[in-house]
């Protein structure tokens, strides 16, 4: 199976596998050799700050999804990862509602940052565990404290703010 030959972490999440299946079918139509297709896929780099896996170590995956500035854009990452420690917060989009149905079981705990912590707390408080961390530095420290309690359990550290972060950062790169 071609799936076993794909080693690119970015592309092996469920939605990307679907896209990959389409790309593979198109490559067959255009008679691209499988070896060339596999090489291209395994060297493909996704867009920075879009579900960017920037570190995998000791069963812990670190994902920067800082371009996710609404709940809908964050939901992709919540749906396709497990054992999530979710860092979120900032300036929410007007009318954005957090429907955690189908994703809450993937989240171990969330860490809320930014100036609008009450907004986020009210969106998630009866659905998932949370802690108000106020800023990214505190959130990272809080996540690592939780990881120490989990001792070698697989985990995903997800920075996917579900909002704009102009209250804390110059831009999504900062």
Question: Whereabouts are the PLM-identified features?
Answer:
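A structural signal for short, well-ordered beta-strand elements
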Residues: 30, 132-133, 168
